[in-house]
Amino acid sequence: VKKFVLVALCFVMLFSFLSAKTVEIWSWRTQDEQVWKNVEKNLKAMGKDITINFRAFIPTEYDAKLFLALQGGTGPDVAYIRRLPGGRTQALVEANLIKPLGKTVDYKDFSLGVKNNVTMNGEQWGVPFAIQVCGIFYNMDIFKENGLTEPKTWGEMLEICKILKSKGIDPFFMTAKEAWTLTMQHAMCGVSILGPAWIKRLSEGKVDFLDQDWIYLQTLLNDLKVYYQDGFMGNDTNDMNSAFAFGQAAMVFYGVWGYQTWKELNPDINVGYFMVPPDWEGSSPYAYIYMDGAFALTSISKNPTDALEVLKYTATPEFGTLFTNITANIPAVDGATMPDVPLLIEVTEAGAKNASPYVYWVGSQFTVQKPSLYDDVLSPGMQAMYMGQITPTELAQKAQDALSQWFVPLMKKLGKIK
């Protein structure tokens, strides 16, 4: 019996040792699977015998699954988290579900602006991984075949849409089944149509959501739907990726993260990019950029030592180079070597030179409490507007009613507080 117990104990100890070398990572990004296979390979080559188990979840379900799992004492060692300020990551910090990293991870290769996106209460809560740039991506071959060039104004873009539609080509492929993409469209158009100065005034409470400029933007978007594909309310990003990759639509409102998928589906596609054009020639276009997210150490990690080794590696230019060559995303870490892809160079330049300093979607102060302009107003509201259930003015009223419940500058403007 003693011999059996000893053997069993050895097996338990061996299993514990083996499992302790595994780092489980949860994410909303399915496209990152190969990244972690390469990270594991590189770490092993460095003498660190760490196995990485990567799991990706549906993006719209991810945050709730992560929070509930961590609250229940289960879940990953490393979790993808959203940027700060933002209610979802703030909730993780306030519930002590993730650990600060400032004293254990070297942030010397991150700019202050990027580092600020993971900072709360004077601590860093994650290692940033990507900078995303949004705008209009187009099929260069379709444009060339039809004698089209990148528009400088919204009116020129409408002329392009008319030409394409007259030739039986869908000008835009929209993904209204996924409401978040409609908020993204609204926001990337807003930085060029409204302009950062107007958005700054909104953030200061000098204008509000019933301002005619805000309603005008929503009217432009509502009028644009005649240039979307038939049945666009039932299409999602998977449909869009296939349709755009194989030339079934000329343009998409999207982010640079889509490029990897389009090239995988159709290596021959030639993709161009332009910022959403302003509605008159005297104004400048702007790019909507944001720090996508970060890698965090969870408080329930069963293997924090190896998880930290993984996180330390993700803070290096070597990881940034690996990451961008697989995902075609712009790495958050400085010093990474970008792939020689003209589109990525152009998008990176747009993000560096034309980023709007004021925004109202991801990374904005309008999303840090409930009801959020992103999740609770524009996501369902844009769907309702596109379906004809509400008007642009009624959508503006919904924003006004929601944000005036907690957004202090707006509350002051409306006389709700002093």
What are these regions (language model features)?
Residues 163, 203-233:
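Glycine-centered hinge/linker elements that transmit conformational signals in sensory
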Residues 125-129, 134, 158-206, 249:
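Extracytoplasmic/periplasmic solute-binding protein
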Residues 41-112, 116-119, 141-152, 247-251, ...:
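Extracytoplasmic "Venus flytrap"/periplasmic binding protein-like
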Residues 83-134, 158, 164, 185-187, ...:
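Hinge/lid segment of periplasmic solute-binding proteins
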Residues 99-110, 193-216, 264-266, 277-286, ...:
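Short, solvent-exposed loop/beta-turn-alpha elements that line the ligand-binding surface or hinge
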Residues 89-91, 259-268, 279-380, 410-418:
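C-terminal lobe and pocket-closing loops
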Residues 21-30, 50-55, 77-78, 125, ...:
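Short, well-ordered beta-strand elements
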Residues 69, 77, 102, 107-142, ...:
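A structural signal for short loop-to-beta-strand junctions that line the ligand-binding cleft
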